[in-house]
Amino acid sequence: MAPTDQLQEVKIMLHGTAASEGIGIGKVMLIEEHSLEYTPRTVTDTEAESQRFKAAVDAFCYNTEKQAENLRSSAGEKEAEILAGHIQIIKDPYLSGEIEKLIADGQCAESALEHMCDMFIAMFSAADDELTKQRAADVRDIKSGVLGILLGVNEIKVSDAPKGTVLVARELTPSVTAGIVKKNIAGIITETGGTTSHSAILARALEIPAVLSVEGVASSLKNGDTVVVDGSEGAVIVNPDDNTVAEYSKKRDAFLAERKELENYRGRETKSASGEVYELFCNIGKPEDAVKAVDADGEGVGLFRTEFLFMDRTSIPTEDEQFEAYKKAALILKGKSLIIRTLDIGGDKDIPYLGLEKEENPFMGFRAIRYCLKNRELFKSQIKAILRASAFGDIKIMFPLITTMDELREGKKLVTECKADLRNMGINFNENIQVGVMVETASAAVIADMLAKEADFFSIGTNDLTGYTMACDRGNNDVSYLYSPLQPSVLRMIKRTIECGVQNGISVGMCGEAAANKLMIPLLISFGLTEFSVSAPSVLNVRKIISTWTKEEADKVTAKVLEMSTQQEIVEYLKSVV
C-alpha cells in the first residue's frame, strides 16, 4: 500500500461552522464546478448577440423556476424565494441594461455578463455584513447558470446521488441544492458559508446535517471517502473507524428519536416544571410565513419583519398593498398575537430604489427608526396600513433600533396622527393598539427604566444587542469569538431590560436567536422573560426545554452564572448543568 493511501485511511477530525443540526454518516460525493472557460471575442452582429443573451436569460429563468418549484415542495415557500430572487436579479433593469450596452459596444455575451456580474460580486463581497456578502454568492450562482447555457455546459445535478451520500463542495449553490432528493443525502460539507448563508438556510429547511466553512475540504477529500458530519458541533470525521461509526450512529439515532419525541409537545401549553406559563411565538418575514407559525404550533407571531415587503421590487409598496399583507397574516393567525416591526431598512438591508447613500458603517448609521422619522410620509403610510389591519386581529406595533426617548415619543406621536387621519376617514382600527420597543442597543437597555414607562411592551433583539454591546460583527472571523449573548455584559443588558419591564408592568419578549438557545433559556426564565419568539422549526424544542426547568432551579443556575466573569466560564458551566 502506498504511503499516501495509508495517510488517507487515518481518522481525521476537521472543524467548521455548525450550520444544520444532526448527525450524518455516508460516502463523499464531490460537487466539482464545471469549466466555464471561453475565448473573449468581438462581435459585429450585436443584435444577434443581444438575442443570444436574452435567449440564455429566458432559459435560465425557466430552469430556475423549475428549481424553485422543487424547493417549494421539498423545503418551503421561503426557501423557494431564494431562487425566485435570482430571476429578479438577472432581470434587474440596471444589470441587464448594462450587459446590453457592453454587447452593443461589441463584447460577446459571455464577456459582458461576466464583466457586470464580477463587478456586483466584488461590490457585495466588500460589504461589512454577512447578509450582503451572501448576495455575492447569489450573483456567482446566476453567472454560472447563464454562462453555462451560453457555452452549452450541462447543469451540475445531484438528483441521482445514491442513498447515504454526503455532498462536499467549495460552495453549494441554491441552484444545485434545489436538486437534492432529501432522503438520499446524509450530510453537506462546504468550504464557504456561515449560519446565515443560503447553503445553511436550505440545509436546515431540508433537515440535512451540515458543516460549513471547512477549510480546504473539497480538495482534501475524494469521492467514496467515508465521513461523519456532526452538524450540531461543527465537526467532520474523515475515515472513521468502526467504533467511531458506532458511536455516531447512536448519536444520530438519539437525535432522530428526540426530534420525534418533540411531537408530544404539540398542542401543549408552554409551561415550566414549576407551573409558570409563557407565550411562545414565531418570527416571520412575509404574510405567508404565518402559515408556518400556525403549523409549527406557535402561539402567535412575535416579530413580523416588514422590510421584506419592500425588497425584490422597484418601488415603495402602497398603503393598500401593505394593509393587505398585514391583514392576510392577521387572518391566518385567527386572533393570535401579531407583532409588526416597522421598517428596519439600512445596515444589512439595502433597498436600491430608496436611494440610501453608502455609509462607512451602516450599522451605526441612517437606518430603522432613524430613517423612518426622516421620511415621515413613508412611515405614516406603513403605520396607517398596520392600524387598518388591526381591525382584523390582535396586532401590535413595534419600533426598531430605539436609542432615545425622543425617538419613541416621535414614533408614538405619528401613530396618534395616523389614528386621527383614519378616524376622519371613517376607517376602523383598534383604538387601543399597543406600541412597543425593540431593545437591541446598549442605549435602549441602559434607559429601559425610562422607556418602560412609555412603551406598552419590550422585545429584546439579541442579535443586534450582542453586536452593539460587544462592538463586533459576527460575520468577521477575526472578532466573531466575541459575539455571544452569553458574554457577561450582554447578559446584564438582558437582565436589566427584563427587570425594568417587569417593574413597570409591561410584557417583555425576546425575538433574537438567543430565545431558542438551550443554554440561555434557564437564565431567561430566571430573569423574568414572559415571551419567547423563535423560528418555526424551534417551537416544540423550546417548549420542551422550558418544561424541564423549575423557577427555583433556574434561579440557582443564574445566580452562579452572574458571579462568573468570562463567557468561557459561563458556557462551560451551563453545558455541565443543561
Question: Language-model segments: which ranges?
Answer:
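Conserved alpha/beta-domain cores
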Residues: 259-578
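Non-catalytic, soluble scaffold/interaction modules
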Residues: 1-332, 338-345, 375, 382-383, ...
